[in-house]
Structure formats: C-alpha cells, structure tokens
Amino acid sequence: MVEQLTQHDPRRIGPFEVLGRLGAGGMGLVYLARSASGRRVAIKTVRTELAEDQLFRVRFTREVEAARAVSGFYTAAVVDADPRAAVPWLATAYVPAPSLEEIVNECGPMPTQAVRWLAAGIAQALQSIHGAGLVHRDLKPSNVLVVEDGPRVIDFGIASGVSNTRLTMTNVAVGTPAYMSPEQARDSRSVTGASDIFSLGSTLVFAATGHAPFHGANPVETVFMLVREGPDLEGLPDDLRPLIESCMQMDATHPAAEPRDLQAQLAPHLFASGSDDSGTASAWLPVPATAMIERRRGGRRTARRPPRPRPRRLRAAPQGPGAGHRLAQRGRPAFALPAVLALAAVRRVRTAAGPSAAPDGGPVQLPGAKVPIGPGRRAGEGRGAAAAAPRRRDRLGPAARRSERFLGGHGPHRTVPASTLRPGTPSPAPDRWRPWRFRMSNDVWGTPVVSGDLLYVTSFEVHALDVGNGRRQFKTRDVAWAMAVEGGRIHASDGPSLYALDAASGAEQWRLATDAWVYALKADRGTVLTATRGGGVQGWEASNGEKLWEVTGAQSDFETAEAGPVIHDGTVYLWQDARLRALDARTGLERWSYPIGDAASCGGVPVRVTPATDGYVYVAAGTRVLAVETGSGPVRWHFEAPAVFLSPPAFAPGPAVTGGGVYLADYLGTVYALDATTGKDRWRIATEARSSIEPVLVAVGNVHVGSGSALYTLDAVTDTPKWRFAAGGDVVGAPWWRRPGPLRLGGPRALHPGRGGRPAALKLATGGEITGSPVAQAGVVYACSKDRCVYALDALKGTGTGNRART
C-alpha cells in the first residue's frame, strides 16, 4: 500500500519525483517515484549504517552494474541507480501487482498447478539473475510479485551487495531466516546460486501450504530450526514433494537442481495435452487471486483483511521407509509431544459427545449450564448487527461428567495465549500525551520493556524510544537476541557475547565473550542469569560482568527462552539431572532439589515454573503439578492430570471463595482450578486442544482462556461460563487486563462490557498481529506488531495514530 510521505522523507531522489512510501525492506525504505516522462519506478534506498560502510559502497557499485545486465521476462528491470549518493539507491521498474505473500495471506494456499506455474517463472528469473553473476540471497514470498502473465522477482542487487560488509561480520545473516538456506545461515558471504534454489523451494512451500518451512518465536530460533532440524512440510501435496525435494537440499555438498533443470521438470505438468497453455494467471490461479491481481493492476485495493490464521502445529516424525529421503530428518521440535499424546488430543476433541461446532456469533450451551454462553459483538458490528445475529443453542450432545464440560469449537486450533495480571493506571491526560507509532527497518519481536521515560524494544538491535513521543533516543551498536532491563542497565546478548549498557544513554559499561550461544537471559536484584546451548547456566554480577558462578548439565532438550531457568527474589530455579534445583542467585550454591524426572518422564515437554507471592513455587512437569516451598523445598501437594501442560501455572492470591488458587490449562485444553493449600481439583472445564505456552489469565474473579478463534470467560469460583467472544480469527499474542479498563487480546482487539455484561470489541489501532505481550504502564499500551512498528496506544480507548509513523 502506498503511504503518504512524512516530513523526514525526501521529495526527490536523483531524477525522480517521490510520490509515496511503498514500505520498508531489510536494507532500507522503498519509495514509489515518477520520472520526467511519467514512468513509475520503485526506489530502494540503503540504511544509514550501510551507507557509512565504504566496503559496502564498493561492492554495491559492482553489484548494481551486474544487476543492470539482468534481462528476463520474470524480473523487474533495473532502471537507474546511484551507489555513490549520500543515501545510495536503486530504481527498478514499478510493477503494480500483489506479492505472493499478500495473495496467500488473503486467498489461502495455491493449487498444485498454480505452484508449478509460479515455480517455472521464478526459476527462469533466477536463471537470468545467476547468468549475470549475481546471487539474490533474499528470495521470499514478499519479493515475488504476481501479475497476469507470470511472477516477477524483485529486490535482487541490494541483498547481494550487502554481503561481505561489516553487517555480516556481526553475526547477522543477510536474508530472511524463514526462507534462507542452511549454508546462508552459517555464512552468507560465500553462498552460491544453489542457495537461491533452496529459497525457491521454501517460497513454494509457503505458496502451497500457507506457512513458511521454518518458523520460530524469533529470528534466532528460526535459524536454529533451519540448521538443526529441517523444514516443516505439513500440508504439502504429495504431487509437489519431488519438486520441493529437488530444491531444498539440506546438505550443501549435495548437488542442487539448476534453474533450467527445474523448468524441464515442470514443463510436462504445465503444458500437457489438453491443458490450458496460455501461461496466464487466469489459467492456474483461483478466481479470488486473479481478481486481486486485476484490482491491483487497476490501482484499486480492497480493505485489507488480516492474514489467514496459521496454526502452530505439533508434528510427529515421518514414518515408513523413505520418509523424507532427500530431506534431513527433523530433530525434536522445541515443544514436540509424543505421537500418542498428539493422537489422543485429536481423538479427545473429535469424539467429544455430539457435534462440536458452534457458529461464530451464536451462543454456546454447556451441558448442565442454566444459560448459554453469550456471544460478544465483533469489531465493527453495530447494535443492529448484534441483534440480527443467530441465537441458536447448539447443544454438544449428552451431558459430560460434571467435572468436565466441553465448550463449542471447531477442533484443535491455535489458541489465545494468555499472560498473568498486569496492573494498570488511568488513561493518560490528552493534553500531555498523544498516541504514537515508530516504524523499524526490520522485524520487531519480544515483549517491550518500560523503564523510566524510555521504552526498550528489540529489532535486531535494542532501540530506546521516548515514551512520550516515540522519538528514538539511541540504539545499540550490536545485535541483541535476548534482552533484560534492570537496575539502570540494559543487559543483552548477541549469542556469543554478553554486554551491558547504560539504560539512559546506551553507553557500553562492559562486554565479555561467553563459552556458548546464549538462548535465555534474565536479570533480578543485581544478578544477570544466562542459559547457553549445551546445558550451561551462569550467574553474572550486573555492575561489571564478573562471573559469579556456573553450572553445567542443565536440561538441553528445550533450549528456548520460555523453557530456560527462572530467577525470582534471589533464587534461581533450573532443571538439571532430572531434578528441579533451587540455587542462590549470588553464589550458585544449591538450597534444595526435588526429583522432577527427565524429559521422557515429563511427557516430552519442558518443566514450567511459577514462583508465587505465598512462599511457594508452582511447577508444571508433564502431567503433574506440584507446590514446592521456596525456602527448603518440601512438596506441599501433588496433582496429576490426564494430559501434559505446555504452559506454566497462574497463581491468584486469596482464599478459594474469592477466586484465589492455581489455574492452568493442559495440552487438550482442559482448564483446572486447584486449591493452593491442598492441591485438590476444585473444578475443570475442557475446551479445544491448546498449544499455547502462555499461562491462562486470572483477573478480578474471572479466568480467561482462548480456544480456537474464541475467548471464553469463566467464573473463577464456580466455573460458571460468563461469555464467549468470537474474534473472527485466531488471536495471537497474550491477553492482559488493567484496572479498571477492558480485557485486551494479543491481537489488535480489546473487549469492553456491552449489553447484559457481554463484551463488545474495540479494535486497537495497530497495523498487524501483535508479537510478544503488550505492556501497560501509566495508562499507555505499548505493543510490537508484525508490521515492523512499535505502537503507543491509549489504554482506555485502544486508539492510536493514523498512517504516519516515525522512523
């Protein structure tokens, strides 16, 4: 979408008049411009830090000359460039067409023949690019435009020009982790055209399935999956597997297919006798996709719909002889479940008594409940629409046992991740603060941190933004995969090193090399805690980086930030040698340990720990929940469930009669309310299969849990269902609550009390799905979004800025 120019954008670049913004790429901003003759071009500019690198300028100049020589029907031709300008730029022919990413997000996965049609065109484009001596290095769905007569590959030249500069010498692999090759992730400076062929296979997987072949919670986890595990090919049609396997060679020493070989392989399928050999999109693509192409060609855009939900799948390993014979076998996924448990989850949901489907917008009658769960109004629906909504009472069959009631749904979908209670304060005064938005050059991930007058977010580096106006005060020089802010310092790691910066100025205070890659980092009361690949856990003095202690042999089955050790109130809790151990945070000396079991005995899922304010730590270990006294380690009680827990327990203080207790949901979606004193099961309600690793949300006597595309609210004392809100799509991120405002979802929505106590929706003013968890402080909501923006929103109204954004 073409956006209006800001006061910081140039009005002319070289001989071109700048008309608007097209977006932001990995190397810099992209503008729509017009030549003196009226020809429209797309101009890619280069980020300041790259422009200051003389090695980059030399290489970029050479690559631009090579890019000018690229000719081919399936590429966007280079029109002009100035590598020596203060801000280097490259202009290519503007193609008014949607990207492959946009088409799949809005219209769904493509048919087999359409994927082959795309593959043939992209392969021919790569043949032209490689013939000019270039390697694309960033082939992905957003860099493939789809027009009526075939795909167009864009953005070659800049990505290849950045290789061998200081950007790649700070452990940043050029390219997009979800689509790059393993050899590019290891060393992007020495890749060949075979790497582009691998990326072509990854792009085709997205086109055919709707999901990337590699996906993690953040880029570093995606790279880890890429080099250690192999691609996720779930949903890929069998007819396309030979094509994908010929592209995605996990072993770089194995000869990859050449572009001309792929074209020869595809030709018999595309132009067989009796087939439509026109070669146009209408011959291969579904009607919605061709309509979208036509609208874009005519300069019209429909209101953008959110991307189709992509469930986070828990996959069993391939079975049978020859399974994935040319693709490396996947290792254990970060939170993989044993196949028998995955099968049990499917059976549990599909065989629930009676029909399980409940219409969106209609009430759901729980067996044994006196009233149905009422639907909340969706965003944008007025009272008339709400009144016209169907009022069917779809019963779910015979009454289940009193202790288990099945809520309506459509099978095992990705659920609404939840977080623990976050206190809030009144809405900001309008005369002192206005909503703002800050656009990053790269993806933003993780949960933002507010400390004093600054907001800290991670987008490769740590960026410090003024909470009042969104202006960037500074950013770190180096990459930060993990970050914690505590005691006036930013503690961060780029993987092989750990460093501390002054939180107010960004000035470096200390830096040291670690013995292994840091995958988790936390800070508490002057101690920095890190977990490294291979089972290492270290404690560091926050003021100077002195190593206080180190232990080895900690669990290494689940090396993710969520499964890492926990530090709270001077105590470190870690999983080591099949025992849960409590260590002194300053000395590393063991205070107590408990035999929790190894990964196999814990159901193949990580142990999750929640330290609470009542002097106990609540532990979820496979199918078990334990309450352990934090001082000396005796177990207060033990609870056993029929399914494993992926998320940690949530603790609510107070007696059970007021909603106090321990709440959590297992993998099958059953929500449990446990008495914090005895561990007895006060009640349980089963929803749909749940793969969220976030805890349920307990606030003001209510338990909020996501199930598929709906959010259910249950009374924490009696388990009485209060309402059901149909979100209109799977909700991502974590819901949170602030007193006295609305309940907020991880996606761009908030729920306000409506008629009869049922919720009405208010859409938060963000431009994409929320990543991490939003944070509320002083009446402001801070959230990071998949549109590469950081938002500051009014916590009471959920409103934000318009289209303008600071950069």
Swiss-Prot record:
Catalytic activity: L-seryl-[protein] + ATP = O-phospho-L-seryl-[protein] + ADP + H(+); L-threonyl-[protein] + ATP = O-phospho-L-threonyl-[protein] + ADP + H(+)
Keyword Flavoprotein annotated: no
Active site: 138 (proton acceptor)
Residues where Phosphoserine is found: 71
Alphabetized GO MF terms: ATP binding; protein serine kinase activity; protein serine/threonine kinase activity
Disordered: annotated segments: 292-328, 353-429
Domain Protein kinase positions: 16-272
Keywords linked to the UniProt accession: ATP-binding, Kinase, Nucleotide-binding, Phosphoprotein, Serine/threonine-protein kinase, Transferase
Keyword field contains Phosphoprotein: yes
Bias (Basic residues) ranges: 297-315
Post-translational modification: Autophosphorylated mainly on threonine residues. Some phosphorylation on serine residues. Autophosphorylation on Thr-168 is the major site enhancing kinase activity towards AfsR, and is regulated though interaction with KbpA.
Subunit structure: Interacts (via the N-terminal kinase domain) with KbpA; the interaction prevents autophosphorylation of AfsK.
Function: Component of the AfsK/AfsR system involved in the response of aerial mycelium formation to glucose.
Name of the molecule in the record: Serine/threonine-protein kinase AfsK
Species name: Streptomyces griseus
